[in-house]
Amino acid sequence: MQKLLLDPALRNWVLLPIMFVMILIGILRHNATILLQSSPKKLSKEEIREQRLLQRAYALRACSNSLLPESIEARKCFLIESLKSGKYLKPVDPNAPKAANPLMDDKTLEGLMESMKGNMLMVVPQTIIMTWINEFFSGFILLKLPFPLTLRFKSIFQSGVATQDLDVQWVSSISWYFLNLFGLKSVYALLLGENNAASNATNEMGMAGFSSAAATAQLIQPGQDISKMMLSEAENVQILKNESLLVDVEKRLLAQFA
């Protein structure tokens, strides 16, 4: 097969500009996310108490095998009694109006708005970049990968190029865009830090989990009956088996090195 010789202008005016524009868009998206993100509402003492009790029950079910059987049993008794008695529940105001539609709850609306902001900051820039590449650089071959690939990768690396006999190692302009979209996470982490909105946007459509306070607030979704959640969790804790990895651990350790 005859080798292709690429014009150096493709590198200077197509390949590098696409990469630089995507890095710039990622930095702008990160800063726009910070500006548009509303600070999460502070939870009341009673709401935090409810969440912490449920978190303790979840943690016991997940990590019970790291405790001694008597420790597991003691925690089970405490959690079952606390979850069933309802003494950690937030006092309910009998005069407070109940929302007819759970979607009209303030927390639900706030979460939907945050999700819409994140989706907008992800979709709009990528739509603009895709339109720009399709309009000006459609059908361009930009680089050759230094390693061989099978034919299954042809549709991935040669998107927009309708040539059947072209070697799979060649990468088109649109495929170069997608490679940058999912491959610039390390660059964003170097420029913006590990927890940045630029790389998070490619994994999560929205800004959920961007702050620890917001992640904690997602434990109890709006409209859920917390008392029923606690009763259900009490049943889960009650059927938990007292299986511990620490039983006879001394004998197993001595037998291993004997």
From Swiss-Prot:
Statement: the UniProt record of this protein carries the keyword Cytoplasm: yes
Protein's membrane topology: Multi-pass membrane protein
SMART domains associated with the record: DUF106
GO CC terms, sorted: cytosol; EMC complex
GO biological process: protein insertion into ER membrane
Keywords: Cytoplasm, Membrane, Transmembrane, Transmembrane helix
Localization, UniProt: Cytoplasm; Membrane
Transmembrane segments: 8-28, 123-143, 173-193
InterPro entries attached to this UniProt entry: EMC3 (IPR008568), EMC3/TMCO1 (IPR002809)
Family, per entry: Belongs to the EMC3 family.
Record-given protein name: ER membrane protein complex subunit 3
Organism: Schizosaccharomyces pombe (strain 972 / ATCC 24843) (Fission yeast)
